Amino acid sequence: DFEYTQPSGYNSWCTANLPAPDIADGSDYFNTVLWTGTSAENPISTVGFQPDFTWIKGRDNSTNHVLADAVRGATKVIESDSDVVEYTDAQSVKSFDTNGFTLGTSNDVNNSTAGYNQYVAWNWLAGGSGSTNTDGTLSNTVTVSANPSAGFSIVTYTGDGVSNATVGHGLGVVPALVISKVLSGSTGPWYVKHKNLASGKNIYLNWTDAETSLTSGGGIGDLNSSTTFTCANGSSNNGNTNSSGRGYVTYCFAEVENYSKFGSYTGNDSSNGPFVYCGFRPAWVLVKRTDSTGSWALVDSSRSSYNVADDVLFPNTSGSESTSDTAIDLLSNGFKLRSAQRNFSGATYIFAAFAEHPLGGDGVSPATAR
């Protein structure tokens, strides 16, 4: 209540008077699910939508990360902790279903043995199995499954060997994060281009390296186009992003206000670490140091249901979940570092975050602290 009559055309300063968010419930487009393995065919039906990209990791066992998507097909697996190319595993993700997915009997996703049977899957909604995209200069067919409203697309293509070829991403805005993996032929790393990496530099999802300058081996070029990304520099190296005749998949993300955020912060080596504003209560936070070596670290609000969020998995290793590494408070409007890990004094870190709930807005209940 006001002591005096407020001037016309003004509202009180509160979350209810923020504009209505385009995405009122983050779980409509991104959701985390947990389960206990059964060693038998296992339908997971709690995602809330039919996922187009599912990333699975065993929590209490040292198994490879399993990444599958609707464009390549459910049984086609790649691993974030490895440079191996795509392989078929009919007993991992068997199908994408109306409200989730069905698992087979692979121990990587569905072991029933006590002490090795806890799993997590992170799920994103794109645009189904995809369609042909002709926005770029690549001469071969490009397939894109895009959800511009949620800032996410899956892109597959066969390389044509042309240096600096461009490939359509279907987002309609400049991406903030692009992650690329070779699917066929010889092994090759996961190239990552984040909007806060220096110009001409990439980082690797399956390694601990600092950001690295692009070489004749290629990579992903700077992010500056609302229609395409660039396969930079190389055409012949087995590890690049456009070697002739080899298949590739690329996951592209753009910022959506109140739903996704991509940025950077500087560490202070304190349990009273930096606060990072996102504009929402995060469901999922991924962090990586860029000025020196260091593992990727991933926390979410499902595995850590209260603060601090310290149930950590590492995309670049097959190791099990750790509770003695990174510690992060997931707040109503962002996150705060609560340990020296991912928070070295003066060090630079990039992050990606997806929302559990927007901070507030017209017709939306305000996000609360955990």
Predicted features by range, described:
Residues 1-370:
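Surface-exposed molecular-recognition determinants
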